[in-house]
């Protein structure tokens, strides 16, 4: 665990509050500095690797907590944090401005951001080239029809153009696995189970990247031509990625070559909470209140395309122009909490089998002919 002081204060007798978060949660440092300037309370930030290791640390230290406030508990860890009573109920100031669909009845955790995780694709790779009126369509050079759902990942035409992050190594990859399970649940009549769909994906040519950053920023090349070496034009991202992709450009372009596939999206929520048994509950509450203030909420969007939990926060110009309001289905956090690690084991088993090069064993069918 790495401990760093996120802010500083010139006061002689500086009060401190301990904040536990993780590397994959974007922490708005300007908002923490403003909190210190207003209150005189210095925020000591401790960082874990991801949401799972962060909640595990809270569980191990529950009798003598290592922090007063926790930030970045996602939908996959919400049940464990609540069920183990690692956090205390608290109703922060400003909660009335939060999207009502994100609120929890037990008030143990406070929503601070939300992510609509979706498939993303190139626009230009699927555009028809202009053709003269006296020209016949050239069938071999006609571009692919644009993918519009998860089923494209098992389509032999689209699978070789897709890259997704590995859920064994990446949180965004884990969200992809959760979305895959939701689209193709096991033990459901008429639905092919997700392990079988995964096998078809891998055998059809879908690439698994070691991280989401590798998948998005390196392998996904929306503007690449088909003649270039193995371009990937279909990947896993979010409804916010078209806006994120122009964040560091000196000027906003007229358009961006990234489209969101508004089908099969899932909504992931990031929460904050007051750590149970904290010796400084009052100041912990003040820090948690600050997470819903406008500056923190305005700065909470991250490289994954997350958005504020509040509904009244002004959008950036990039989001206004390129952001997509996707129809993302909320996760059943109570159901998923105890079983997503089992899905990871199944993913590993299926991917290892495909890597081995072994062909799937066909089922043995026995036919009994009735006697005359």
Role assignments for model-derived ranges:
Residues 10-80, 357-369:
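Early extracytoplasmic/lumenal segment of secretory-pathway proteins
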Residues 65-70, 88-124, 151, 161-167:
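A structural signal for short loop-to-beta-strand junctions that line the ligand-binding cleft
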Residues 87-94, 107-111, 151-154, 247-266, ...:
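Short beta-strand->loop
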Residues 97-101, 115, 195-204, 209-211, ...:
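Periplasmic-binding protein-like
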Residues 120-125, 181-182, 268-283, 299-303:
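A bilobed periplasmic-binding-protein/Venus flytrap-type ligand-binding module shared by bacterial periplasmic
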Residues 178-258:
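Ligand-binding pocket segment of bilobal, Venus flytrap-like solute-binding proteins
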Residues 275-332:
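Mature extracytoplasmic/periplasmic domains
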Residues 328-372:
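Conserved C-terminal helix/tail region of periplasmic/extracytoplasmic solute-binding proteins
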